[in-house]
């Protein structure tokens, strides 16, 4: 399939720097392509800022194992549906807005990933998000997975902070945070506008909230704080949160 359907790189589509580590120019002849295949180019290290954003309609991308940097907005506003970066062993950072406004349904990241940047995967179509194997990932940045369709969520085992709006506007009903012993802070609006009915959580976590808002997430955060940040199984019953032991 790769030989018959995937784009074969050539000077017809791109200009390269001298050592073939990055694309310096994308030619007009590439505009109608829907597949970007860099898989075999092991010297390729950098995808520059905005290089494939807005004016392209990429459905699939295949990156080389030695890629190190995908810069801000690199694939903004494409139509990528399946994104598998698990072979990219040197990629430790997904920069800001890189895959913002695509159609990603299935996502796999490199095991060594350390940072998922601001707004990196927002406005996609992810339904199941499993980050449990990414042990170096300690922070979920602002807005990084907002406006998806996430129903099932597993966080990294070493997660410490979930930042503002990180999972805003998804489809999470049951949120189980009871296994994350290093989780210390959930910033304001992290799970805003999810249809939450049950939250399992450990004690003494700093959860920020807006006292003037009465949505499901803010009312939970206020109740958790008023309940002395007690570990428990919190359930929404008749539009009110109630505490049960784990």
Please provide the spans of the model-predicted regions.
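PEST-like, low-complexity acidic/proline-rich intrinsically disordered segments
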Residues: 1-7
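Structural signature of tandem-repeat unit edges
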Residues: 7-21, 30-46, 56-69, 79-93, ...
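Short linear proline/tyrosine/threonine-rich motifs used for host-factor recruitment
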Residues: 25-26, 243
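Acidic, Ser/Thr
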Residues: 27-28, 51
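Consensus positions within tandem repeat domains that build extended binding/scaffold surfaces
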Residues: 48-51, 71-74, 95-98, 117-120, ...
């Amino acid at each position: 399939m790769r030989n018959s359907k995937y784009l074969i790189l050539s000077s017809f589509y791109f200009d390269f720097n001298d050592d073939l580590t990055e694309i310096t120019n994308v030619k007009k002849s590439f505009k109608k392509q829907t597949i970007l295949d860099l898989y075999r180019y092991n010297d390729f290290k950098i995808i520059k800022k905005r290089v494939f954003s807005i004016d392209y309609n990429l459905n699939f991308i295949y990156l080389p194992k030695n890629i190190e940097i995908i810069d801000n907005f690199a694939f903004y506003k494409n139509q990528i549906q399946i994104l598998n970066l698990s072979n990219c062993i040197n990629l430790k950072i997904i920069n800001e807005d890189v895959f913002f406004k695509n159609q990603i349904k299935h996502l796999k990241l490199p095991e060594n990933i350390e940072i998922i940047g601001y707004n990196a995967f927002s406005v996609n179509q992810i339904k199941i998000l499993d980050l449990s194997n990414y042990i170096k990932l300690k922070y979920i940045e602002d807005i990084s997975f907002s406006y998806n369709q996430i129903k099932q969520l597993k966080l990294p085992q070493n997660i410490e902070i979930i930042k503002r709006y990180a999972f805003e506007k998804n489809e999470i009903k049951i949120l189980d945070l009871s296994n994350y012993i290093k989780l210390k802070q959930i910033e304001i609006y992290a799970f805003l506008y999810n249809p939450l009915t049950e939250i399992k959580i450990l004690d003494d976590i700093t959860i920020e909230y807006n006292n003037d808002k009465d949505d499901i997430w803010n009312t939970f955060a206020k109740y958790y704080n008023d309940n002395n940040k007690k570990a428990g199984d919190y359930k929404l019953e008749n539009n009110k949160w109630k505490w049960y032991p784990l």
